[in-house]
Amino acid sequence: LVEANPLGLLKTSGENDLYAMFGAMTRDYFAEFEAGRPDAARHVIDFYGGEGTFAAFPAKIRDYVVKTTPANIRDWSSGTTFEHPRSAYQQIAVSTLVVRGGDGHPAMMRIAEMLTEFIPNARLQTVAGGSHFLPATHPTELARLLDIHVETGIA
């Protein structure tokens, strides 16, 4: 699980302040999208990567993000209601690698910790200097962790 975001895990575990951060971000994001602002998705990108991340992306990436914003809005609209209890995660029987970026959003850092606590046979790995965009920013380190996990079941 790379930067997995079952947001409801925060809510069902009483991490209300962290859960509220997602609510604040999506309210702004959805409102700007509905108002027709082309760069509304910058709220999501900057939430995960830090202020200014969207603006720092190459134009080609920003254009892609803008083009795919309607699909991302649907993802956010449906994903925020995913609220399975801790017991659901305790049913996962396979060896699970949970990977997070060391510079990630505090809510994402906590979700990774909780997944590791709740899933039996889960291990947490933190990629130094990374955030939510690990496949793009740290592909070699991520591939190394995944290779180890697939080969040995651990990382």
Enumerate the predicted regions with their spans.
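Flexible "cap/lid" loop of the alpha/beta hydrolase fold
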Residues: 1-32
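Conserved alpha/beta-hydrolase catalytic His-Asp/Glu region
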Residues: 34-73
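Alpha-helical elements of Rossmann-like donor-binding domains used by nucleotide-donor carbohydrate transfer enzymes
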Residues: 28, 39, 43, 67, ...
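Short helix-adjacent coil turns
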Residues: 25-40, 137
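Conserved serine/cysteine hydrolase catalytic core
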Residues: 61-117, 123-126
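Catalytic active-site module of serine/aspartate enzymes centered on a nucleophile-bearing elbow/loop
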Residues: 120-155
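Conserved strand-to-helix beginnings and helix N-cap segments that scaffold or border functional pockets
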Residues: 12-15, 108-112, 136-140
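Acidic/histidine-enriched, beta-strand-rich ligand/metal-binding domains
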Residues: 17-20, 41-50, 111, 115-118
